[in-house]
């Protein structure tokens, strides 16, 4: 049974059970990829806010090793909607964009998180829900900040 840790009235954190080996496998497979690009924001690269590289994946064809994580994300979404009944009073949910895996540079960070679209598509600017998952292999750092809510998540 999923039990989120609530950090704010709308922000919660889920732990994927027995995920360490899977996360290590994904990190190892991506380590030597030639697909890494500097992370960008709408309007272009803003290195002061994103000290990371990223690889983008399409939602309709994820790598097989990502499937357990995406399945867990679906379970989390269902649990979140069950816990927050107001979230159900919205247009239907769907994955309308691909996803990124980020690699932080040194002691880099994701300096902010807000309602924005990395790719600039007008429909994505008004995201209803954002899902962030960490495949962290470090003990310190790697937080993401939600400044509007005053929340830091690791």
PLM regions: where:
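Fe(II)/2-oxoglutarate oxygenase catalytic core
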Residues: 1-154
